[in-house]
Amino acid sequence: MSHCFVKRLSLCICTALLVASCAKQNKQAFYNTGIIYCSESNPVTFNPQLDTSSTTSDASSHQLYDRLLDFDPESGRIVPSLASSWLVSDDGLTYAFQLRKDVWFHNTRYFTPTRNFNADDVIFSIDRWRLRSHPYHYVSGGRYPYFESIGLAQNIASVERVNGYRVEITLKRRDSSFLANLATDFAVILSEEYANQLAQTGTPGKIDELPVGTGPFKFDSYRKDHFIKFLRHDNYWRDQMEDAPTSDEALSYNNTVESANQEVENGQGGEDTVQDGTAQNGDETRPVVEQLIFDITPRSSLRLAKLMTGECDATAFPAQTELEVIRAKEDLTLAEKPGLNIGFWAFNTQRPPFDNPDVRRALAAAIDKNTLLEAVYFDSATRAKTLLPAASWAFQNDADDTAYNPVLARKLLADAGVKAGFSMTIWAMPVERSYNPNATKMAELIQRYLRDVGVEATIVSYDWTTFRRHLQEGLHDSVLIGWSADNGDPDNFYRPLLSCGAIPSGTNRAMWCSEDYDKLLNDALQTDDIEERTAIYRQVNRLLYERLPLVPIAHAYRYQAYRNELEGMTINPFGGVRFGGVKKAL
């Protein structure tokens, strides 16, 4: 062996060792300063105005953006965010928002902001979804499902710039849920300056593909079916906030918030309804990690395996069958909380014979909901009588509920002219959700129940994007799906799921429209009195029981599994995972 060869071999070995050492150091550096989250699917978009799925919200609203208002993660109360305070007129129609100063948008490889966030960004963001004449309204399809489903655009008379840091929004009629809707995942604030830059280059669609926000993380890269990479937003405005207030200041502030939130909950609040957010961090806190990776892993069992081996720090939607495994692992944490959600079986009421309430009643009587809960949820859910869970202030414990009665089911079907052997489809969503962790299994159980009453059911499923598109097209006979609340107002369940306006937006899976129902919902938003609203919602529950466009099945607990090294993880009351303020204990 020549001396020259030995030298070259030694050099190669040293180089390999150096590379391995650097790689190990880089991996350790990322482990110390980065978080990997095992996500279940691809986001539909990086603009949550355009999509209502929790996958999209997790990858966009919760990490990239801020809103005018937020929800406190513990109490669910409305707290300031980009709006530091607000005033409400005596007639309840005009809302004046004071905006924070020194808030910067993300500085990325594709956009460098030249100014701070201001009133122009608020007006641009709201007018995009509310005005069809807006130059960005039809970009990326021109559908804004959440806002369409609640009819908010039709109720806003104007959005006006008072000055650079003050905006006034005037409504056409009172809406006791208005502030709560501004705090939802979908009411994000975009950069008008970035939009203008894209318009000048003829690429407006990039605003939803290469996002820019003010949130705790900024977008870096995305590879479909593989990963999303976020970087820390170094100029995040919450990092610039002053230290926490003194105890006297905190007491004064908390009293103001307590009073104002009570007025908001009661639909009240005149010129003296003021909230000052200078000492409040809301639901997003300071990011203390340099990188955030979403590892897109559709299979729940694989997500759990990655969590257990440390390849992921947290995981989405652990399966009910995995909960005991997670609880038994000393290095893992399983947080849980009753969910503000509803899992249901919806009938396409625009397709015969499902347009007949008696047929819908027959199908509801054919299934045993208790068995579905035991087999699919494993004691991690409660039986649903109405759309509202027990945590809602309008919950009705004595509401009417469907009962398992196959004899009645056969009679109703026969009386409606539905002959034995009638066939239908049950669409089962292909993703796991807290409100229905295994739609396919539930569909199989319902399929057996229906066979007992002479109905042959075929189970249909597609990939998530195709599934949602075909639902929007109304190709289903029935579907197993659900809803997680975006805010604590009862209207957030009733209106998006079953109002006439929610059909074109795609959130009304029953495609059911009732003028009586819509009138009751509108009446409920006109009153300031909680007892009056509750009484109206009792009428709503009775109407839904009589006409049964869908069968409420379960209100599920929400779970979040993560490694013990993570600190600051919380379960948001309205769903989703947020990594602002989460850090790793080294």
Locate the predicted segments by residue.
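Aromatic- and charge-enriched surface segment that lines or borders ligand/interaction sites
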Residues: 84-135, 168, 306, 353
